[in-house]
Amino acid sequence: PAFWQASMTVPVYFDPALIDAGPRPTQKVGESPAQYEERYVDWQTKMGMVDWDALIVNGLIAKDPSLASRRDELSSLYTSSEAYRIRDMVFKDPSLIGKKVEMNFLADANIDVWLADNIDRSLPDDQQQLSPEVRQLSDDLAAKGVIERTFNTQLFTNPDSRSSPATAGLAGAFMGSLFMMLIVIFISIPLGVASAIYL
């Protein structure tokens, strides 16, 4: 990913009608750990089946009602990991259900490359990564300011990603380098100095 990346700020309403898994289970008095675990796993399964993409798509339509007729194309605009991110948020804090939260989502890697003009726009459709409809939609939203190019702070905080190139970062490399330097400073150098003194 580059230092600048396409993203969009979306008002996400955690609609109780869509997140219909019920409240997070708590262990009842007299309930065995196995029974509680069964109920909790069932709740997790229901949460996993929620259409999290619909929350983002609904937020985009709420921000720009003219997008209602292009609903099927909207999920192509953002990276696939964003739906899992809002799912994990609700897992950690179920009180979000029923609330509206302004969230920033990374655009899909192909959208980002298209808007950065790193793809030859004169190529025929069969050589493009995006459909003509999605290309036009991304251009329209960029012109309206719905999709913006912002500084990519996640480049420094995210680990590598095999499934979502747009969210790949350098955090893993930084941590690996840090631990290597700590090993060198606290183990390798003292051992080297001690060996030199001994010899």
Regions found by a protein language model. Name each.
Residues 2-166:
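Membrane-topology segments of multi-pass transport proteins
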Residues 79-80, 177-178, 189-190:
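Short hydrophobic/aromatic segments of transmembrane alpha-helices and their interfaces
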Residues 152, 170, 194-195:
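Generic hydrophobic, aliphatic-rich segments that mediate packing or membrane embedding
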Residues 164-179, 183:
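Alpha-helical membrane-interface segments at transmembrane helix boundaries
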